[in-house]
Amino acid sequence: MNNCIGIINLDENEQKTTELTRHRPLASLPIAGRYRVVDFILSNMTNSGIEAIGIFTKNKSRSLMDHLTNGKPWDIYRKKDGLKVFNFSDEDPVHDDVHNFLDNIDYFDHSKKEYTLICSSYMVCNLDYNELIKYHIEQGNDVTTVYKNVKHVEDNFIDCQVLNLDENSRVIGVGENVGLKNSANINMEMYIMKTDLFIDMIYECIRGGRYKKIKNYINGNIDKLKVGAYEFKGYLACINSINAYFNANMDFLNEKVNKELFYSHFPIYTKPKDACPTQYTTTSNVSNSIIANGSYIEGEVKNCVIGRNVYIGKGSVIENCVILQNTVIGSNFVELVKTNQTTCVTTS
């Protein structure tokens, strides 16, 4: 897929993750102990052979820039193509992702790539985009989006887009999951199209003034564009709320999910941080947990995901929790969470 430019658009709704994203974009939110949310989509692109990747982010981007560095952990630190980051502020009510794309239109013109893949960051999966572009070309679509047929969406993937498909997997309608159906075709917000068409969409959005997001333009023109849908059958999580964030971390404790995401043919890369291995004292008791390096465990930990440099004191019992990095939990502290509740513990 060296003939494709990858766009990661961070214009995501963070209203339901405010407590976790007040000082950072959702893309740089720690997940699975040592990773960040953006690692999954970024690794998917590089594993698929995409060498030119642009990340379009809003404000609060310090932690994201610190994490991305020069792109070397993902092998996109290059003289040609490589990683580019474009920032804009969401304080201007008329400045949205379409205007951000317009301000940087030369990036797309000069790329000389035939195809453009535009994605959000909050869809967690392990996906080979080579199969997507192959399907896109075979079907002769103008735009191809990725979806997953998900069961029990009355409790999961709330507020995600739902696709209505015909017998040829063509998109004929787009709605929103409000939790009223048992199953639905969840739109993963990954769109592949010709770069020329993508540029035309940007100008059309500006001229018409009706659409402020590329995905809304696509949804509003499914009668004019041939929009196909490619089915993804692997594990998928959408980090669009604190509840979804917690549930995804708990899913990583499942052996099948963990192997699919982190130990498949395509690995997930992240920025390395040097620290000593986690130390477990004779008073510690740990089971079915993911614990990043640099931590010191004296208490009992069960079914937890724990970030880097966390201290858990003697006599403390932590169960079914997500503990973010640099958290200090003193002695004789007890936090037992039922499976239908959520909690995130972090330092101030």
Residue ranges and their predicted role:
Residues 1-7, 196, 204-348:
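Left-handed beta-helix
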Residues 1-250:
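Unchanged
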